[in-house]
Amino acid sequence: MKNFYFLILILVFSPLHVFSEEVFLSLKKNKVNVRYGPSFDSPIKFVYKKINLPIKQIDKKENFRRIIDLKNNSGWIHVSQLKKINSLIPLEDKILFKKPSIFSKPLAKIKKGRVLLVKKCNENWCKVKTKKIEGWIDINNLWGKTPIIKKN
């Protein structure tokens, strides 16, 4: 009976979050087919036309990944169309700063929904890049993966 309670305690207090870590990927090309099922024989559901768009992987089967996007569209994409480059979409308008501080020089206003490539992140800020400009945004209200780099 003691073993049973011990097992229950282990299951309750074990770090289950390891199994539930979100996997974000980005679209590799400007045109990516999303299918109804995990096969090239499966019909095309819709087509993305945005390189680097961040999407969340929710399942996998062989060489296909089931994904969901910011607008809750879902389907299957072949791995050849995906990459692990980190990208983000702001869920609200953001100010791009020269340094990771609100007291730094503002460089630009980033509109909600714009795809940004992530260079690096710390606990509160991400250094991001567009086609024309690079700077820092705060990490609140973003869709995508923010790889936290902790200071030693």
Where are these regions (language model features)?
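Boundary regions of SH3-family modules and the immediately adjacent low-complexity/disordered segments
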Residues: E21-K29, P38-K50, P54-E62, I68-K105, ...
